[in-house]
Amino acid sequence: EYSAEFCEMLSLRYPGLPVLQGDAYALEKTLRSGGGFLSGEKDTGHSLDGIVSSFPSLTRPEAVRKKLLNEALTLLKPGAPYLQFSYGLVMPVTPDSRAVSVHTSEWIWKNLPPARVWVYRKGH
């Protein structure tokens, strides 16, 4: 989570949940900064079981979104999911590689605003 205040509120509300404050667009640096998500400099990736993102990715330039997706897929175990919630009509990030599979949920109409979940996987 980017907001320190929101992290504090989440930590108080969910004391058993690890909450990490940082910038998702500097994902590896943020994950190395604390919480034990990535260990040390020798951990070069392929160690995470999944990533769930709900930030408004369509507000960022396509190049920034692609950089984040590529970094996330490098940090994930082969075939592990990167999930992106989106309210937009278009795919939030178009992968650079055919090695990345993309699947989407149906529209979730009970959510306001309606949303879809996009699932990206590499090496699956």
Whereabouts are the PLM-identified features?
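A short SAM/SAH-binding and catalytic strip from SAM-dependent methyltransferases
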Residues: 46-64
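Conserved beta-strand signature within the Rossmann-like core of class I S-adenosyl-L-methionine
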Residues: 76-88
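S-adenosyl-L-methionine
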Residues: 5-41
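Core SAM-dependent methyltransferase catalytic element
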Residues: 107-124
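Conserved acidic E/D residue at the C-terminus of a beta-strand in Rossmann-like folds
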Residues: 1-2
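A short glycine-rich, Lys/Arg-flanked "PGG" loop and its adjoining helix->strand segment in the class I
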Residues: 66-78
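Short, charged/polar "capping" segments at the starts of alpha-helices
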Residues: 5-8, 90-94
